[in-house]
Structure formats: structure tokens, C-alpha cells
Design a protein with these regions (language model features):
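Conserved AMP-binding/adenylation subdomain of ANL enzymes
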Residues: 199-216, 223-311, 319, 341
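Conserved AMP-binding/adenylate-forming core of the ANL superfamily
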Residues: 21-65, 69-73, 90-95, 195
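A short N-terminal helical cap/helix-turn-helix that marks the beginning
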Residues: 1-21, 38, 176
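A short helix-loop-beta submotif of the ANL/AMP-binding
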Residues: 57, 63-83, 87-91, 99-105, ...
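Conserved ATP-dependent adenylate/AMP-binding module captured primarily in the ANL superfamily
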Residues: 87-121, 201-218, 251-265
Length: 354
């Protein structure tokens, strides 16, 4: 590991201060890199006023959105520990995990809070709404002292020296994250993740899958999962990509429209999503008898499969360079469509822009 991933984020924020970093697709919320820096600075001030120390736990339970990643960045760079919780967990499980993790603060979305508000959460010093960073609850002693912090005018500007980490370097072997998964037995389990682990994965991504600043990503995977957190946030943001977050369930119609609008360079997903797109866009074509025969005819098979592959790439916006797909085995037919086994010279000669 050469650098902590926050080092790369610092460089991106400095170099792309006025450029868009995060967007809630189809909604009005978006952040420039400079606005991310300003909001992180507000959060750090808030944490100090709440008496939150380095190593204290702060839980996040919400849908994917730009505010989620801003809050996460603030927590990690403050040297507190982020506790990421899936919004689909049952309210009683969420309450138990918040207590189990010894979290002192909760940042929660309205969908989650609708049921969670009926649970006892006595250990929390503050509960904040993910939608607008307003307070839902403050423990006695803090009321009247901190409500103004998240709306204060920022003194940071493009020419101001800024670093996400303000108080010395981070111990890379210290705890950064507790990630609660659904668990193979149906009972959520916590995985403890260090700063070193996150940074190694980010650096591997930057090395293996190079990104040009300003390239776009559509995020459809849950940010509370490690796959989505790394592929749809930490790695592309560290490289200067602009990330569009789907705030609704990624149905084929929503996803296809987002892909056509955004034209991402990278798609991180699970096999089921690609198979649904394949079924929606290509099954009507491939169900024709003549194509069924051609599919297994050596002389024309590669031509047909290349056409199908290009159609799939076009369905994902036409600019996709990388598919990251994990979590389960992919349908072999779909996989063969995506794998391009032609030589580099053949690809240059035969392919046209989608």
C-alpha cells in the first residue's frame, strides 16, 4: 500500500473543486468536490461538539444517496468507525446491531426510521436524518448547541488548503468500518475492516481499472455492502469519477434509462441484473428460430454473439469499459455474450462505436 485512500480523495478534491462529484439520479441533490469538503468540515465540527472521539462508532442506515457517501467520508476521515447497516434489515435487528456495535450516533433515512422509531435506542447521543442532515433526536445537554452546525456558512474555498484528515495521520491498521452483512444463516454478522484493507482495495482498483477524471459511474449496488461501497464509491471517487446514485430499486426500466442518460464507463452489478437486462432487450431477438440455429453454427456464431455483446453494451450506455460482476455465478449464455475473445486487431477492425 502506497497511500491511504483519503490521500487520493484529497488530491481529487483539490484538483476538481468545482466539478461534480456525486449526483442523486433523477433528483435535485448533487455535490461538487468543494461542497463535499465543506460538508465534511461541518461534520467534523459537529462530532467534536457532540463529544465523539476517535474510534467511536457512528451508524448509517439508509438508501443509496449522495448524503450517504458524504456522511461516510466525514466519519472515516474523523477517525471514527463507520457502522454500515442495510436499510432492509428488520427494525428489531437494526436496534440490536446499533446497540451491539456501541454506536453513539445514527444517521438514518426516512424509510428506515419509519419502523426504527418504535425501538428503544437509549445509548445514542444523536439521531440525524439522512435526507437533510437535520436532527431527529438529541440527548439532553446538546440541545440548542449543535443544531446550527450543518447549515453554517463554510470558510473553505478553492484556494484554501484542505485535508480530509485534520488531526495527524491515520493508523492504517486501526478499525475503519464495521460492516454488518445479512449472514448465511439469516442472522446479521459484523465484519471488522481496517483502513489498510480499504486502502489496498482502492489502490488495486486504481491500478487494474484506470479511471479518467470526470468519467461516470451509475451506482446500483447497496453501499452498505462491501462490493458496492468499494466499486461504486471509494475506488471511483478516489480517481475523480462522477458517481450517480440510484435512489430507487434498480428495476430494468429505471436502470436502462439511467444507463442511457449517464453513459457510465464502469458497471458494477450482480448477475441477476445483467440477466434481467439480457432478457428484456435480447430474448425477443434470440427466440427467433433462425437465430437459434445460427447461435450454434460455427461460421456465423461469433458474428451473432458479437452483435449480441454490442447490443448489451449499448443497453448499458454504450461507453462501458469494465463490467464488475460478483455475488453469484452468471448464466453461461449471457457470459459468452459479454466475453470478447477476438484479438485486439480484430476488435479495432470490426467494432464501431455503440
Amino acid at each position: 500500500m502506497k497511500h491511504h485512500f483519503l490521500h487520493y480523495m484529497d488530491q481529487v478534491i483539490h484538483n476538481r473543486w468545482r466539478d461534480i462529484a456525486f449526483v442523486d439520479y433523477g433528483e435535485k441533490v448533487q455535490y461538487t468536490h468543494g461542497e463535499v469538503a465543506q460538508q465534511v468540515r461541518r461534520f467534523h465540527h459537529l462530532f467534536r461538539l457532540l463529544g465523539i472521539q476517535q474510534g467511536d462508532k457512528i451508524a448509517i442506515a439508509s438508501r443509496n444517496c449522495s448524503n450517504w457517501v458524504v456522511a461516510y467520508t466525514a466519519i472515516i476521515s474523523y477517525k471514527a468507525v463507520a457502522v454500515t447497516l442495510l436499510q432492509d434489515f428488520k427494525a428489531e435487528d437494526l436496534a440490536r446491531l446499533i446497540e451491539h456495535s456501541d454506536s453513539k450516533m445514527l444517521i438514518v433515512g426516512p424509510y428506515v426510521w419509519r419502523d426504527l422509531q418504535h425501538q428503544a435506542l437509549p445509548q445514542l447521543q444523536a439521531i440525524m436524518s439522512m435526507d437533510d442532515f437535520s436532527f431527529i433526536h438529541l440527548a439532553e445537554g446538546y440541545k440548542g448547541n449543535v443544531e446550527h452546525v450543518m447549515t453554517e456558512e463554510s470558510t473553505l474555498s478553492e484556494n484554501t488548503f484542505f485535508s480530509l484528515v485534520q488531526d495527524g495521520e491515520i493508523d492504517v491498521d486501526s478499525l475503519a468500518l464495521i460492516n454488518y452483512t445479512s449472514g448465511s444463516t439469516g442472522s446479521p454478522k459484523g465484519v471488522m475492516v481496517s483502513h489498510r484493507s480499504l486502502s489496498n482495495n482502492v489502490e488495486d482498483g486504481l491500478h487494474i481499472l484506470p479511471v479518467e477524471p470526470g468519467q461516470r459511474v451509475v451506482s446500483m449496488l447497496p453501499l452498505a455492502h462491501m462490493f458496492g461501497q468499494l466499486a461504486d464509491f471509494l475506488y471511483p471517487f478516489s480517481a475523480g469519477a462522477t458517481i450517480y446514485y440510484l435512489t430507487k430499486a434498480p428495476t430494468p426500466s429505471i436502470l436502462l434509462k439511467a444507463m442511457a442518460d449517464v453513459k457510465p464507463y464502469l458497471v458494477a452489478t450482480v448477475p441477476l441484473v445483467i440477466e434481467k437486462i439480457h432478457k428484456k432487450k435480447l430474448d425477443p431477438l434470440l427466440s427467433k428460430t433462425v437465430l437459434k440455429v445460427c447461435w450454434h453454427t460455427p461460421l456465423v456464431m461469433n458474428f451473432i454473439r458479437n452483435h449480441v455483446r454490442k447490443s448489451l453494451v449499448k443497453a448499458f450506455g454504450g461507453h462501458v469499459r469494465y463490467f464488475l460482476c460478483g455475488g453469484a455465478a452468471m448464466n453461461p449464455v449471457v457470459e459468452k455474450c459479454l466475453l470478447d475473445k477476438r484479438s485486439a486487431s480484430e476488435r479495432r477492425r470490426q467494432d464501431q462505436p455503440c
